[in-house]
Amino acid sequence: MTLQQQIIKALGAKPQINAEEEIRRSIDFLKSYLQTYPFIKSLVLGISGGQDSTLAGKLCQMAINELRQETGNESLQFIAVRLPYGVQADEQDCQDAIAFIQPDRVLTVNIKGAVLASEQALREAGIELSDFVRGNEKARERMKAQYSIAGMTSGVVVGTDHAAEAITGFFTKYGDGGTDINPLYRLNKRQGKQLLAALGCPEHLYKKAPTADLEDDRPSLPDEVALGVTYDNIDDYLEGKNVPEQVARTIENWYLKTEHKRRPPITVFDDFWKK
């Protein structure tokens, strides 16, 4: 088995999907989890205005709507959380995503004050954060807020990780990578677009250039610039297609060096890091 085949198998990626079937699969997955653990009353998700959180948010709300109708349990809710750092450049996209999702509840937590306070505390301890590390601080502060909300609403935190993100480890460890349940896991980027199109999402929300937008020195830096490959390259690779050798090497290097992000904390029983 080639490394490409191993990666595809590990991430559960498929070369082709039926959008309607995958929508139903994700909704049923969320519903089944909530029904298995009836003490869970809410799904909590940060909404950025990008493709992934828009899709995950819509699926969460659909799952909650169906469960409420089927069970009569009106205590179930989907909580969409806006988590700007100061003023967000694409705020209108966030509002458009909220309008599309129609969440039960919307909360806004501006993380700038908390990030700056943490940065100052570290500075006083003799640690000056780089812009890159400050970006990770933002991602972790966002996740901290979501877990606080989930803790107070008997909820679980929903993630947006998918195959095209997992393969490169393009997420912050214990930031946006630290979630309870991931309904998009298995899909690549273009497949996520197919689901949103089938759901009637406004096109500008999934045709915009994806960006983590964590660095102050490089605001709205496109993911594809940071990664050195395009999402079309990544999707082709995940679909088992032949890609240029340099593209495959770049993708595989990302995968191998970020393996620790896709695993629990390393123990004495692990040996993947020795290979």
Swiss-Prot record:
InterPro entries: NAD/GMP_synthase (IPR022310), NAD_synthase (IPR003694), NH(3)-dep_NAD(+)_synth (IPR022926), Rossmann-like_a/b/a_fold (IPR014729). It comes from the Bacteria. Its EC number is 6.3.1.5. One of its GO terms (molecular function) is glutaminase activity. GO terms for cellular component: cytoplasm. One of its GO terms (biological process) is NAD biosynthetic process. Mg(2+) binds at D52, E165. Coiled coil: none annotated. Deamido-NAD(+) binds at R140, K173, D180, H260, K261. Keywords: ATP-binding, Ligase, Magnesium, Metal-binding, NAD, Nucleotide-binding. ATP binds at G46, I47, S48, G49, G50, Q51, D52, S53, T160, K189, T211. Catalyzes the ATP-dependent amidation of deamido-NAD to form NAD. Uses ammonia as a nitrogen source. Belongs to the NAD synthetase family. Homodimer. This is NH(3)-dependent NAD(+) synthetase. It comes from Escherichia coli O6:H1 (strain CFT073 / ATCC 700928 / UPEC). The gene is nadE.
